[in-house]
A protein has these predicted regions:
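N-proximal low-complexity "stem/linker" segments adjacent to membrane-targeting elements
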Residues: 1-21
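Structural beta-sheet core signal
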Residues: 5-7, 34, 107
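Amphipathic coiled-coil/heptad-repeat helices and related helical stalk/stem segments
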Residues: 16, 90-94, 114-116
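Short, acidic, metal-binding catalytic loop of nucleotide-sugar glycosyltransferases
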Residues: 21-30
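Acidic ATP/Mg2+-coordinating residue in the GHKL
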Residues: 36-38
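Active-site-proximal specificity loops/subdomain of glycosyltransferases
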Residues: 43-100
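Short beta-strand-to-loop acidic/aromatic patch adjacent to the donor-nucleotide binding site
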Residues: 78, 102-113
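Conserved catalytic core of nucleotide-sugar-dependent glycosyltransferases
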Residues: 83-84, 114-142
Length: 142
């Protein structure tokens, strides 16, 4: 199976495209998946080996509906209020990527340019595998 790289994209198509080109230049033959949450500037580049999950109109994740499930969330925590729940949206996008790509992937920020070979990132003995877990609010300690 080919190695998979996932990128969550928000309104910066030139930067995301440059990130993919740098990955291709210094990396192997990876399948790249772009989860597009743009509301102004979607990722429209046609690139071989790149699959776009289009969530620009909430086709995959309706963020307002999902955030409404947590009416008592604290808007003062982190940058949530200042960035329109960007962190929450990013987390939900990564969770959806786990569902869409169950065999695993390396998550890459869209604003990162690769300068050397990154095949070592795929060595299981050298990396951390993450997962998302849910916990009832009663079990969370503050």
């Amino acid at each position: 199976m080919k190695k998979q790289v996932a990128i969550v994209h928000y309104n910066t198509p030139e930067i995301t495209e440059s990130a993919i080109w740098s990955l291709r230049k210094h990396g192997g033959d990876y399948d790249v998946f772009v989860f597009d949450n743009s509301d102004e500037r979607p990722f429209t580049a046609k690139m071989k080996g790149v699959t776009v999950f289009d969530n620009t109109k909430g086709q995959i994740i309706d963020f307002e509906k999902e955030l409404a499930k947590y009416p008592e969330r604290d808007d003062r925590i982190g940058c949530a209020k200042g960035c329109s729940y960007g962190s929450d949206k990013h987390m939900m996008s990564i969770q959806k990527l786990w569902e869409l790509l169950p065999d695993g992937f390396v998550l890459m920020d869209s604003d990162v340019l690769i300068k050397e070979n990154i095949d070592w990132v795929f060595w299981e003995g050298e990396c951390c595998c993450g997962y998302i877990s849910t916990m009832s609010p009663k079990r969370i300690r503050t």
